Amino acid sequence: RPLRPGKILICIFALAALTTATETDLQRILRDGNDQFTAKMLPEIVKENPNKNIVFSAFSVMSPLAQLAIASAGESRDELFSAIGFPNENVTKAVFTDLNRELKSVKGVTLKIANKIYIANGFELNDQFAVVSKDVFNSEVQKLDFAQNKVAAKTINTWVEDHTNNRIKDLVDPNSLDDYTRAVLVNALYFKGSWKNKFDKESTIDRPFHVDNTKTIQVPTMHRSGQYSYGESRELNAKIIEMPYEGDETSLVIVLPNTVDGIHNLLEKLKDPKVLSRVEKDMHEIDVDVYVPKFKIETTTDLKKVLQNMNIKKLFNGSEARLDYLLKKSDALYVSEAVQKAFIEVNEEGAEAAAANEFAANFSSFTRDRNYLIVKQTVRVFP
């Protein structure tokens, strides 16, 4: 069966920890939480990037939010746990401990997740939070003089580059750091995988790409025929294909609307966090004639605005945030800035993707071939 593209590319790099039939309770909680968080985040990201090709990782945002939830109190804490879909601190710690252990065993691809907390000179992490950050999230800790904002930003950005194979650059703007910055939480995720069945470069030629119902352009498009897990969904009015990487534990899932203007309906359907799981159950191995454009996308997202629209509000309010357990000194802290930079490239050899997030905690000044591809990276964790 032919699978041909059309219109503007929308790409989600949603690295999800999934499992086979022998899924454990912790893996189910993580999968459900990630699906729920991604479904909420997707429309907000699209709203912030109208008519653009986008890439983002909801999964990589969950780790720093989970850390902040554990460091929070009151309504700040409630909002964060509700957003990430975990019932309480103990479950959250168990889920991320299990995840970090399982990801070390993923075969056939390069997959790295790193966390780091930078704190201002003269301050210390809360003792209990320091233990959780190290044991659960594998977070490194480093002191910085944020008043030297250019030096501090360069230090953080160099760490991000080192942990994303130089794909994510200039995550932190020096102007976002100053004397009032007390801590910066940074998360970096990097993935690189080779296709189990590679595309022949000689088969890549310019083919029509439908920007909309009236405009068509030529773009380099890969082609391969072979057996893939494939499905056609009436619910989504779309075709779905899963393209495995080497090792058979990771894959790229592509959802293609049946009509040139079908992306808007598809995005509405994807607000249901369970819809892809339902659709994937009906996929089967068949011979497929696959056409996929080569693409490279980079997106910078103002997470502060996105997360506020997802009902994480107290965290960013200088008079209402309760980050009581982040530092030993009980300064009135709030998150002044949250940014994600994400990158993905897909070519004949495979795919490379990276994402990095920055959450800056400041001393509160109040107390002083169609919009056409939806792409999901999956990691199958075998217990």
From Swiss-Prot:
Keywords: Protease inhibitor, Serine protease inhibitor, Signal. Residues 1-21 form the signal peptide. The record marks F363, S364 as: Reactive bond. The keyword Signal applies. SUPFAM superfamilies: Serpins. GO terms for molecular function: serine-type endopeptidase inhibitor activity. One of its GO terms (cellular component) is extracellular space. PANTHER family: GH10112P-RELATED, SERINE PROTEASE INHIBITOR, SERPIN. Belongs to the serpin family. This is Serine protease inhibitor 3/4.
